[in-house]
Amino acid sequence: MAMSILAKIFLVFAIYCAIDPFSHSSISKFPDFKTYKIDMPPLSSLPKERDRQNLLQNSEIRFLNEVQGPESIAFDPQGRGPYTGVADGRILFWNGTRWTDFAYTSNNRSELCDPKPSLLDYLKDEDICGRPLGLRFDKKNGDLYIADAYLGIMKVGPEGGLATSVTNEADGVPLRFTNDLDIDDEGNVYFTDSSSFFQRRKFMLLIVSGEDSGRVLKYNPKTKETTTLVRNLQFPNGLSLGKDGSFFIFCEGSIGRLRKYWLKGEKAGTSEVVALLHGFPDNIRTNKDGDFWVAVHCHRNIFTHLMAHYPRVRKFFLKLPISVKFQYLLQVGGWPHAVAVKYSEEGKVLKVLEDSKGKVVKAVSEVEEKDGKLWMGSVLMSFIAVYDLP
């Protein structure tokens, strides 16, 4: 009898989730939403290296509540900075005593772009205000290149101001979620477009869908052409050139791995997996020794692993009447935390730094090494963390 009652309750619950009569689910406004399998490697194959000392808890928190969502951090060719893009669409410059407005990407800025109390409040107007993500300086002329999530690849001169468009489409397909970039010695720009369907404001839907419309692209300043180098990717994110310029490393965010794309030599035009990651990667930056710092947004967990391999179960779960915030907390294992990993060119783990409980540093988006310090930005936090390397 008890089993019969439980079966009926489950049936009613399943029907409720299937039709979502009160539009309580996180995908209720997207009737055509689809989920796909993510070929995430087994947990047993992941790197075993961990930072049991939680060394990132020794970081210094700077500029608390002075910068909202500083995704990327850059220093100009003279070593000045940092520069960072924030949630209201501006690129800010630290002049040594205070933050000043350096540049912006949108020419449609209005009062909608004024500072807001919460980072989430900016999402609905990001397409109007712009949302700068990856930042890179051209070391030859001091131009700053910007990966704006909505406007594509932008460029602004050393004096700052309104950035101009470099490219916003490839192969007739608009850039929908421009994410990170790097520039070689000839001025070619390599960059990621995380999705051809979802814009940044719907990044959680992109993560949970597993769709594979992401691309890695190249802009040639001489021909003004943008070409696709790698396609059919699940949330490509960070990208950084190798020290000698013969390859770049990019990350596949949903799968959680690093791939090397060869630009020169007998392997030119091909790519290969060089590392499986502890979790879900964001930006990548190369240090002066040619090693790569990868910002890992969060560790993998059993929940994310199971959801990756069973898309129908994932979609059913998404139809539950629970908030996007709760969905996010499940993805990150219950609480935001911080992981930064240094890799060699061959994909060998050289160093792991963590704040596993998020006591000081959380949700790292980028790790920039400069003068013995790691500068860490976060698209979800309102500070920059600085860690002194031993």
From Swiss-Prot:
Signal peptide: 1-25
Organism: Arabidopsis thaliana (Mouse-ear cress)
Keywords for this protein: Glycoprotein, Signal, Vacuole
Gene coding for it: SSL3
PANTHER family: PROTEIN STRICTOSIDINE SYNTHASE-LIKE 3 (PTHR10426:SF106), STRICTOSIDINE SYNTHASE-RELATED (PTHR10426)
Residues the record marks as carrying a glycan: 95, 108
Alphabetical list of Pfam families matching this protein: SSL_N (PF20067), Str_synth (PF03088)
Entry-linked SUPFAM superfamilies: Calcium-dependent phosphotriesterase (SSF63829)
Family that this chain belongs to: Belongs to the strictosidine synthase family.
GO cellular-component term (any): endoplasmic reticulum
Localization terms from the record: Vacuole
Principal subcellular localization: other
The protein's name in its UniProt record: Protein STRICTOSIDINE SYNTHASE-LIKE 3
